[in-house]
Structures are given as C-alpha cells and as structure tokens.
Amino acid sequence: MTAAVTSSNIVLETHESGIKPYFEQKIQETELKIRSKTENVRRLEAQRNALNDKVRFIKDELRLLQEPGSYVGEVIKIVSDKKVLVKVQPEGKYIVDVAKDINVKDLKASQRVCLRSDSYMLHKVLENKADPLVSLMMVEKVPDSTYDMVGGLTKQIKEIKEVIELPVKHPELFESLGIAQPKGVILYGPPGTGKTLLARAVAHHTDCKFIRVSGAELVQKYIGEGSRMVRELFVMAREHAPSIIFMDEIDSIGSTRVEGSGGGDSEVQRTMLELLNQLDGFETSKNIKIIMATNRLDILDPALLRPGRIDRKIEFPPPSVAARAEILRIHSRKMNLTRGINLRKVAEKMNGCSGADVKGVCTEAGMYALRERRIHVTQEDFELAVGKVMNKNQETAISVAKLFK
C-alpha cells in the first residue's frame, strides 16, 4: 500500500514539474505578443496623428487659396478704437476698419497688415520681415569693453556720456529741463585713436541692444537696395529699443553731394537721403541713439552734420605723451614686466603714434621676449618694439650698442 502511494506521488510531481515550465513559457510568449501589439498600436496612432496634421494643414492651405486675395499694408497711425491709418503701395494711404478679432491696442506703427481686397478691412497682422543681412548687424553679445580700457580720452568719454548714456539712463532730467534729447554723435579723427573702442564701451555701460553696421555694407549693387536696408535697420532698432546704432566708416555713404554724378554715386546718394529721412523721422523718446565714426569729417555732407541729426561732434586727436603713457599702462598691466620699466620714457619716443600703435608696441615687446625665451618683458624690449612699430632704424642701432656692452 505504501509503495503504491509513493509511486503515485512521484508521477504527480513529475507531471507538475513538466506542466509548470510549459505554462510559464506560454505566459512569457503571450506577454511578448502583448508588448509587440501595444508598440504597434502606438506606432499606428502616431502615424494617424501625423496624417491628421497633414490633412488639417492641407485644408487650411485650401481654405486660404479659396479666399480672395489681400493687400499688404503698413500701419501709419491708430485713429480710434476701430479705425487705423494704413499705407498701401502704390495706391496711397487709407483709413480702414479693423476686424473684431484684432485688438487695436496691439497694433504699432510700421507693422505689416493684411487688408481685404473688397472692403479694405484689416483682418490679419503679419510679422515684420527683415533682411538677413540687417539681422546679422545686431550684436547679440554686448562687448565687454569698459571705460577703464580706454586710455587718454577722458574728455571724449565725458562728452559721449552726456549725449548717449545720460539720455538712456535718466531721460527725466531732460524732461525737467524742457530740452530735447540728443539724437546722435559723430566721432572723427585719425585711424587707431579709439573711436570704435569707445563705442563698444558705451554699449557695455548703457545695457542697450548694440547694432553695428559699416557704411560699406549699405552700398549695394541694385537700385533701392541700400535705402531699403537703412529703413529695415531703423525698424529693427525701434523693435529692440533701447538700442544704439553704431555706423562705422560713414564717409562711404555720407560724402558731399555733387552735381552731374551718376551710376553708383547716385545710388549712394539715395542711400544717404534715406538715412537723412530716418534721422529726421525717428523720435528721440524711443531710446534710439546713433553713433557715427569717420576718418574724413571734411568730406561729409553738411546736411548730415547739422544739429537735430548729429547733435555733437567729438574729435579724437592723436594721443599726447601723457595719453600714450596711460595707454601703455592699460595694455601692459597684465604683462609680466621687470621692475624699473619707465613707460613714460617709452611714450616720449612715440611721437605721432596712435592708440593702436601703442597697443602694437606692447604686443611686439612681448614677441621680443618670446624670441629670447624669457617669461618677462624688459625696458629694452619696449624700445625695440618702438623702433619696429615706428618703422625706424632704432632696432639696428640698439642691437649694435648691445654688442659692445
């Protein structure tokens, strides 16, 4: 009896041990199928959503194609809560109604809008298009130049602060005095005297959008392109106010107009006329300031330099001995100098040099130290650098004297 029970238990255990792995395997296979089906369903749902988006896009395109065409206009002025003055090219200016779904308070001057072809009702607001070349003129990262990095220009820094920085930071002072804010300033002087460096420092301290453009970039091949770029430049400045427009080498488009000029000169004159129009048009309360720089003030058109357009002219003369010594201290303060270097003596030997030449002397002095495998700069390195930068024979004379020491 006991033997029979034992044999039956063995058969049952063997049966269970064979069934359990079988069902476990089936469960795993079923779970894999479920996961596969679930992933397939998700993939099909994603495809369905993508196709639905395409269908909606095509329906919108079809609806737009079936609608009557619209005129593109430019907002000039808001007349009332339901009326807007719009300019349409080439027809003219119209006072039009505004659709109910558009808030008139959101409209701004120079904004592009759509007008219905039948009723001239304003029914859509468009984004202002900008030339990629004009968009690239905006400097996204404000220069890290400060007034401490500008040497020998104490008077010029004070004057440009009064014209550019003070109206931006404290406009209430001009309102209390009852005077108009200055619109712009022109910096003139020989090359390398610090005009661009000071403009970068102003952009850093005023915390404004800095738009830098060279006058040569506004000289275009086709008729009207330069004028259009000037208009878009000031539109971009108004959109990102407060902003500073720095126009370098303004003499390339602002030279004096002469009779009988044609071809490329006439296009340059049209560009300058558009610039004059924009300088007269934009309001000083918009916190848009313009800085111009040139090496040739004598050839600029008097209409560009009159008060009301350019309110101050700041001269950048060649630096004096004291100014050159200060510039040397600024550019050499991070250099590894030996003791006893007399920068004043170095500055006295650089008659007629500009600030850029002084910076070049510091660089050349470091190069002379590298040639002799030294990690410090000596007085003699500066004297050799002065001779090289000033293009004189001092380098040869000093080298010969060094041999007989």
UniProtKB/Swiss-Prot annotation:
Residues that the record marks as modified (N-acetylthreonine) are 2
Q: List the disulfide bonds.
A: none
List the molecular function annotations (GO) for this entry. Answer: ATP binding; ATP hydrolysis activity; proteasome-activating activity; protein domain specific binding; ubiquitin protein ligase binding
Q: Where is the signal peptide?
A: none
Q: Which PANTHER family match?
A: 26S PROTEASOME REGULATORY SUBUNIT
Its Gene Ontology cellular component terms are: nucleus; proteasome complex; proteasome regulatory particle, base subcomplex; proteasome storage granule
Instruction: Look up and give the organism this protein is from.
Output: Saccharomyces cerevisiae (strain ATCC 204508 / S288c)
Q: Which UniProt keywords apply?
A: Acetylation, ATP-binding, Cytoplasm, Nucleotide-binding, Nucleus, Proteasome
Alphabetized PROSITE patterns for the sequence: AAA (PS00674)
Identify the SUPFAM superfamilies for this entry: P-loop containing nucleoside triphosphate hydrolases (SSF52540)
Top-rank taxon of the source lineage equals Eukaryota
Q: How does it assemble?
A: May form a homodimer or a heterodimer with a related family member. Interacts with OLA1, TMA17, and UBR1.
Q: Where ATP is bound, by residue? A: 189-196
Q: What is this protein called?
A: 26S proteasome regulatory subunit 8 homolog
Family that this chain belongs to: Belongs to the AAA ATPase family.
